[in-house]
């Protein structure tokens, strides 16, 4: 294959995490003929940019899971990495299996509440069924409360009202502004207006005080949701879109001194973890001052993989520089807001560029597979 480089037989890159950053790094190394092993808890890549649509649209979830084996063959291993031994340069899986590395790319991502995240060791067929079952819970509910009005909560509320215009959807959020805090004020206001136009009821400046007592993601008629404003909201279904945290379990015991307070890994401009020239952090687990986005993870992966190749071929390392915020928020298939490089985008561009397809086609193309009908 064109672009392959001459590699020492001792070189073996291990990629921990098969999200957007992980598959981008794997494809880059594969193209250049660099031996690697991609490890993930699921047996398929989850295009979780489309997870919320898979939560409301029956039959859609199968388009959001792309099997790793068909793309990477024996270069993929399913399992959970529980430990990294930097002395022996091995990663240890939960089944006791050890995999040696010469270079390590950590793409562990974040975990959070279903349906926005799917974080359990699973088969993709089982994961697809979980989303199909969740669609039925939404279908059964008359009133849905979405807790958390960040980007995920905004998208969730909009997807429900787009697919089910007869359902009452209430979004509860502690801030007066919705969506990501890093967005331009005008974009956040636009997101708020789209929600209102879609008929979402907004309870802003409020926190849910009894979340721990509520059964999430299951339709239960007459659930009472309490806020810190002494309000009670009655709903049939509660969906939590808050509390994502960095997946640091794989490296916490070994790389504690390299971790920021959030659990992310401190990196230099080459995305090398502090104190290591052969360990890289990519995506959400890299402590960079920018939003945690699939788009950024892909950029990180290209830098990390390129730097591994450059280090093997005696070339200078490339640097990663954060830029102005680029973020597109899909608010159902017919609406979207966002900005590019710090500039607000027209809604029709976001709708056409992201909301209609959620870029599912792009992941299938990058994985070299054909999407199911």
Predicted segments with their positions:
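Eukaryotic N-terminal low-complexity, Ser/Thr- and Lys/Arg-rich leader segments
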Residues: 1-12, 218-224, 364-373
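Beta1-alpha1 glycine-rich phosphate/pyrophosphate-binding loop at the start
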Residues: 2-77, 113, 155-185, 348
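FAD-binding core/adjacent interface of flavoenzyme oxidoreductases
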Residues: 2-11, 73-145, 239-241
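C-terminal, flexible cofactor-proximal segment of oxidoreductases
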Residues: 10, 291, 300-373
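Glycine-rich Rossmann-fold phosphate-binding loop(s) that bind the pyrophosphate
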Residues: 17-20, 148-150, 290
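Glycine-rich active-site loop/strand segments that organize a redox cofactor
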Residues: 41-47, 51-56, 107-137, 338-339, ...
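A Rossmann-like FAD-binding core segment of flavoenzymes
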Residues: 76-84, 90, 99, 165-269, ...
